[in-house]
Structures are given as structure tokens and as C-alpha cells.
Amino acid sequence: MRIKICGITRVEDVLFAEKAGADAIGVVMYSPTSRRSVPDAKAREIFSALGPFVTRVVVTHTESESDLEKILAIRPDAIQISHPFVFEKYPGVRVLRVIGRGDAVPTDCDAVIVDESMGAGKAFDQEFAKVVAKTSRVPVILAGGLTPENVGLAIREIRPHAVDVASGVETEPGIKDHTKIAAFIRAAREADHGT
């Protein structure tokens, strides 16, 4: 089970998330409607603060080649995009595609993220998530409405490869609550290990 803490906007939050056991960190870039979107310099600062064993993910809604070049310049391990945006694969950069109910499960990616709300923190469709988890040929990441209180049940019911949280561990958009991060990671690990 892997755990991604997404929508990081502050170095102190990324340092805490890494120490608490997060496997991946997400920063939002070139997404002007998101209150979690950060400029290039801030994304670089956040990623630079991480040790070598945490996966760095850029979440974006851009379709601009120029923006993508700037994103690639900060050297993310993966880029998370909404399906069906056509995205050329770049060597060494994994592609995570976000899908919702009714979307076909894409195969032109390294993993799919089941998120009905496309990052708005609304609960995922459990039946759709179960079908995707059982039929996908790539790893499935569960997102949308997850909190420290419900992540354990979601993991036990759906058995995703990973879980992804943003608003479920925040005090306000982009400001993480360290107590909630620790509780989320603990609950996810306990559910994964059957405790």
C-alpha cells in the first residue's frame, strides 16, 4: 500500500508528511482554478526538501506544451493528468491518469486514479472503484473524499494499490493538518496490514 499526500504548498508540511511515512507527495501546478496551485519556484523548493525515497508527483490540468516543459524541468517522478488529455510519455516520468464513473480505464498510463470529483474532495463511487480495481491492467489509486476516519474501510473494501488525500488532511486548502496526516497514514497502514 502506497500513500500520497497531495496539494502540498508548504515545506513544513512536506517535511512532516515524509517523516510520518508518506510514499509520495503531490504538488499542483499550472491549474489556475485550484487554490493549491503553486508556482515553479515553490514546487522546486518543496521537492528539494524531500529525501530520495519519496515519489514526487506534479498534478496539472494544463495542456500547454510550454507548461509541460517547465514542469519537466523540476524533475518530477510522475505527472498526474485528467483523462482523456493526450500526453506524450517522457522517459523516466510516469503518467497517472484521473478517471471518474463512466470513463474507460485507460492503458496509456502507469496508474489510474479513481476520483469522481477530480480533486474536489467529494467521495468516490465505491462500486465503480471496485470494478476498476479488479479489471485495470495498471495500478489503481483511490482518491476523493478520503479522511483518516474512512481510509481504512476504503482500503479493506477496494484493495487499491495506493490511496491519495488532499482535503481530508487539511485545515484549509493547501494548509495541511499534521495530526490528520499522521492519523491518515496510520489508518491506511493498519488497514493494509489487517490490524
Swiss-Prot record:
SUPFAM superfamilies: Ribulose-phoshate binding barrel. Keywords: Amino-acid biosynthesis, Aromatic amino acid biosynthesis, Isomerase, Tryptophan biosynthesis. The keyword Transport does not apply. It is an enzyme of class 5 (isomerase). Gene3D superfamilies: Aldolase class I (3.20.20.70). Pathway: Amino-acid biosynthesis; L-tryptophan biosynthesis; L-tryptophan from chorismate: step 3/5. It catalyses: N-(5-phospho-beta-D-ribosyl)anthranilate = 1-(2-carboxyphenylamino)-1-deoxy-D-ribulose 5-phosphate. It holds the Pfam family PRAI. It comes from the Archaea. Its EC number is 5.3.1.24. One of its GO terms (biological process) is L-tryptophan biosynthetic process. GO terms for molecular function: phosphoribosylanthranilate isomerase activity. Belongs to the TrpF family. HAMAP family: PRAI. This is N-(5'-phosphoribosyl)anthranilate isomerase. The gene is trpF.
